[in-house]
Amino acid sequence: MTGRRPTRPRLFSRGSFLESSRVADILRAETTGGLLLIAAATVAIVWANTPWSASYADLRDLRVGPQAWHLDLTLGAWAADGLLAIFFFVAGLELKREFVAGDLRDPRRAALPVVAAMGGMAVPALVYVLWNLGGDGALQGWAIPTATDIAFAVAILAVISTHLPTGLRTFLLTLAVVDDLLAITIIALFYTDELHLGYLAAAAVPLLVFALLVQRRIHRGWLLIPLAATAWVLVHESGVHATVAGVLLGFAVPVLRSDGQEGPGLAEHLEHLVRPLSAGLAVPVFAFFAAGVTVGGFDGLVDALSDPVALGVVTGLVVGKTVGIAGSTWLLATFTRADLDDQLSWVDVVGLAMLAGIGFTVSLLIGELAFGSGTPRDDHVKVGVLVGSLAATALATGVLRMRNRAYRRLVEIEEQDADADGVPDVYQRDADEG
């Protein structure tokens, strides 16, 4: 009796119907948030380059908050430290769900986004460093071009009407999730100027109480929100960037249901509650306060782009991300003898890698941490992030639009449900073959 010939592993496979549906729901929410982000950033850039630019700077630098608690922060700092903690809380929920019940639970499926994210971090950082070996503190910004802005990316997909097939959409989201984990690790390890261990130890108390409550499936807002706020204040006072508190709180929330049944757990429940606040308010407001840079016309743009810091950011996002993600994916396929999923080509991988070069929100945050908000070098970083993200958008649009007809056919196949049982036929065939 002849044994069945083993099949070669497939990259960018579509996964289960439940996981694909969850990814589609998340990307729809991120699309709305991304459009708001783009609108907020556009308003900020236009305002900062009008005769009324001083009023924009005055608003960004307006201080509010109790001075006795060291929380008399500017509105820009509140957006970066406070509102982005909400964004990273959602990222923490996503990360834990992916590792416990999602694609990252399976080492074989996790290998691709993890390797691609690491390549997409290492190569842009290397490109930036090569531009800035001259010293004078510029190397502090090495991590700026390592981030991917998923909300911005999927908003661009919506604007250009590209129908990405499920495998590519899932990869893009999972890549962004791993990217967020790497970004918050970098922020915690490399952008902590001073550390106050007493405050850090004190922060463990509300974090532990929060964890105990959610592990017991107690999720009353009047209990959890004050604990989360207390943890945020203490982490902020410790010297660690306060957004780290958001990730730690997200990690504390259980993913699986306490009754052992399938279905959404507390992490997914909180994600549905908080994501609209993150995508619809936190990230756009941060973008509004972070993106406004006075360019100074064409001469100012040329001056900013003559700075190796800006050049390192632009080439890191445009070239580094593409080479890092596509190159590491090719190496993984070569060493594991894997094939791309049917009807996909390496052009698709390159287009997606270009799209990942849109590094907006976290790149701007790291730029502020590296060089200080409002400094001349931070302004050059903003110009670099904007130019690099726009260039990555243009290149990705050209490649992905070229493949849009093929994508549309794939999406039509993935949506066919001949037996009208609510599950597209292609997923049932995949399950039978698996």
UniProtKB/Swiss-Prot annotation:
Q: What is its main location?
A: membrane
List, alphabetically, the Pfam families matched.
Na_H_antiport_1
* Swiss-Prot/TrEMBL GO biological process terms: regulation of pH
- By its UniProt entry, which InterPro entries does this protein fall under? Na/H_antiporter_dom_sf, NhaA
Q: How does it sit in the membrane?
A: Multi-pass membrane protein
A GO MF label: sodium:proton antiporter activity
Supply the alphabetized keyword list.
Answer: Antiport, Cell membrane, Ion transport, Membrane, Sodium, Sodium transport, Transmembrane, Transmembrane helix, Transport
Recorded catalytic reaction(s): these are:
Na(+)(in) + 2 H(+)(out) = Na(+)(out) + 2 H(+)(in)
GO CC terms:
plasma membrane
Q: Where in the cell is it found?
A: Cell membrane
Residue ranges of the TM segments: 34-54, 73-93, 111-131, 141-161, 171-191, 194-214, 233-253, 278-298, 313-333, 346-366, 380-400
Protein origin, superkingdom: Bacteria
**Family in the record:** Belongs to the NhaA Na(+)/H(+) (TC 2.A.33) antiporter family.
Concerning HAMAP family, the annotation shows: NhaA (MF_01844)
- Functional note: Na(+)/H(+) antiporter that extrudes sodium in exchange for external protons.
What is the name listed in the Swiss-Prot or TrEMBL entry for this protein?
Na(+)/H(+) antiporter NhaA 1
| Organism of derivation | Nocardioides sp. (strain ATCC BAA-499 / JS614)
Taxonomic lineage is: Bacteria, Bacillati, Actinomycetota, Actinomycetes, Propionibacteriales
